[in-house]
């Protein structure tokens, strides 16, 4: 957006997930500014120095490679610390894969649950998969292409093969696609294929009537 371009031109510093990717955008729009790498591998070390710059009255833009900073991307800890110190935070809305996948799925969107990437620890992973199987709201997940088949098989085990699902790939990019119907059919579609790109998954709510708890 024109607002985002103006921000990138005028801030003191741009903290970006990958300087090479951000430079492509800057070159396209004729933006010249200072860049530093700020990603999951170095954000813990770099946050204190960025906070110092902010406390000196300087402005910093945080840019991720894809999607929205802080949503399974660097930025959350920096924003939290900056806000606690009274620094003004402005979010420039941009592409958000979770919302795009939810809207394009046609599943109920007035209430939904965002889980991001499931944990690798099996006990935690199984607990969340069980929660997803019983959710009465649409669930949105992120997954890497290398682990998509594993996750689809787990969802089939916990939710059943007939549960409605949509796998969205490369949202907003050239090869964007949305594959959906039920878990069985989506799993069959992807098995045996080379899967590339950013993956976002929408899982429909359970159609079972769950027992309710009354509080007196």
Role assignments for model-derived ranges:
Residues 1-40:
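Glycine-rich, flexible N-terminal cofactor/catalytic loop recognition
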Residues 8-14, 87-89, 137-139:
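Short active-site oxyanion
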Residues 16, 91-94, 141, 167:
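General beta-strand structural signal in soluble alpha/beta enzymes
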Residues 42-50:
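Glycine-rich, highly charged phosphate/nucleotide-binding loops
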Residues 55-115:
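Short glycine-cluster motifs
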Residues 58, 138, 142-208:
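A contiguous loop/helix-start segment that scaffolds small-molecule binding in enzyme catalytic cores
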Residues 115-134:
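A short, charged helix-loop
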Residues 207-216:
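Single conserved hydrophobic/aromatic residue that forms the stacking wall/gate
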């Amino acid at each position: 957006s024109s607002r985002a371009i103006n921000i990138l031109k005028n801030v003191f510093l741009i903290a970006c997930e990958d300087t090479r990717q951000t430079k492509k955008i800057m070159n396209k729009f004729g933006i010249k500014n200072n860049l530093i790498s700020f990603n999951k591998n170095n954000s813990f070390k770099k946050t204190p120095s960025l906070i110092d710059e902010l406390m000196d009255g300087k402005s910093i833009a945080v840019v991720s490679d894809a999607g929205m900073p802080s949503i399974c991307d660097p930025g959350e800890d920096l924003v939290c610390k900056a806000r606690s110190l009274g620094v003004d935070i402005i979010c420039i809305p941009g592409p958000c894969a979770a919302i795009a996948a939810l809207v394009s799925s046609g599943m109920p969107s007035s209430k939904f649950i965002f889980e991001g990437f499931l944990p690798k620890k099996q006990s935690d992973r199984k607990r969340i998969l069980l929660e997803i199987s019983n959710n009465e709201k649409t669930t949105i997940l992120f997954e890497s292409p290398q682990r998509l088949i594993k996750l689809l098989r787990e969802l089939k085990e916990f939710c059943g093969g007939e549960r409605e699902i949509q796998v969205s790939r490369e949202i907003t990019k050239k090869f964007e696609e949305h594959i959906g119907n039920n878990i069985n059919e989506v799993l069959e579609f992807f098995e045996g294929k080379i899967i590339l790109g950013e993956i976002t998954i929408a899982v429909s709510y359970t159609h079972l009537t769950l027992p309710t708890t009354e509080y007196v």
